[in-house]
């Protein structure tokens, strides 16, 4: 591999822990450098997430790197996240190299089986970027903490990559979690001298209140570490979706102007929850995350999102009683919508003849009955569907919709004599609507990103509002990417007001 580090002035964002704010800071740096006329390229050697994006070549990458690419003003490509691990439960993960699935790994065997090929994928990703962008600056994001002593020998994306590229590193610490001084000094103390020399600055993230009150703390950190504190980022609530789906339970903010309550089922193996971001951004909608075992209540609508383990999650809904609550809600005329795995769960039957999902189940089951709200049958296949789509919806009304497929299995109508089903859009395999549940229909789609489409999203919302005797909202011509641009710019404005990025660029 040729030496790509010279002349590229790579910057790297490391964190004292998972959730410190590395993704957000990296996003802000990308947009800030774009404003300065540079060509920033986000890069995370290895990410672990079930929140995926499909790029223009139909390859999988982490959604957070896609957001960073948009912030950089460029098209997301899988080379920006060459290794993606998608947790499947039971200490196993699907391994994605440069957008393609290459196998499933047990955590205990990862280093032995996948470390070398993972590093090769990372080098290939770096070469692809160097070939595609002649003059650029790599903006690297680390993962978790760089000083997990028991894991350092198999750490592909922190210090190994930083040293490989001789990157200038900034260390981000989350003061909201408490113990920020121990986070910073403890992390630095565990670094080897050559590793510590890479740390050029420190950022304090998520500070609540008057930043000037932290001045003595800032001085102490600089004196103790001999590293400058580049700034203090204030608390920015819920800017982007967290990589860890468990963080969804911490979203307790209630909207004062919410008129519509939507129950989103937090499946145990929830994936692609960024599909719900456009609804989260609607000021009149409150999303309430409901887990198996919780009481569904009386929402205006229910959404079942994507799942990494559809059969296991279906079993969880059935055994907890939440599945019956959803069926009762639908039978009383409530709106139910499923996305990808959620669509499969809403069907009549799910068959797994090849045992694709058998390893996740306590007992071997080749088929399960779904919630039977949409008359379709799903058969799981080993081949994964990975395709970007641009189609016309037939329901709730005609509208152009764009998104992507990312799933195992094929669903087809069962031609039930009791229940009629119609296609959701002009491509017959992308989704269906149960025509019997009038006036609001149970429906579902394989199309991730469907709510990003502004007109379609408002059409869907307005049928719910009509049932609730609320006025219709105006249809939107702009899609969610316009809203995302505003959020990225807002984030970057705050970043530039509080963080001395110029210090890193000049040193």
UniProtKB/Swiss-Prot annotation:
Example GO BP: cobalamin biosynthetic process
Its annotated pathway reads: Cofactor biosynthesis; adenosylcobalamin biosynthesis
Protein family membership: Belongs to the CobB/CobQ family. CobQ subfamily.
* InterPro entries reported in the protein's UniProt record: Class_I_gatase-like (IPR029062), CobQ/CobB/MinD/ParA_Nub-bd_dom (IPR002586), CobQ_GATase1 (IPR033949), CobQ_synth (IPR004459), GATase_3 (IPR011698), P-loop_NTPase (IPR027417)
Q: What is the purpose of this protein?
A: Catalyzes amidations at positions B, D, E, and G on adenosylcobyrinic A,C-diamide. NH(2) groups are provided by glutamine, and one molecule of ATP is hydrogenolyzed for each amidation.
Active site as annotated: 340, 448
Molecular function (GO) terms for this protein are:
ABC-type vitamin B12 transporter activity; catalytic activity
Tell me which UniProt keywords the record has, alphabetically.
Cobalamin biosynthesis, Glutamine amidotransferase
CDD domains from the entry?
GATase1_CobQ
Q: Which PANTHER family match?
A: COBYRIC ACID SYNTHASE, DETHIOBIOTIN SYNTHETASE
Top-level taxonomic group:
Bacteria
Q: Which organism is it from?
A: Prochlorococcus marinus (strain SARG / CCMP1375 / SS120)
Q: What protein does this entry describe?
A: Cobyric acid synthase
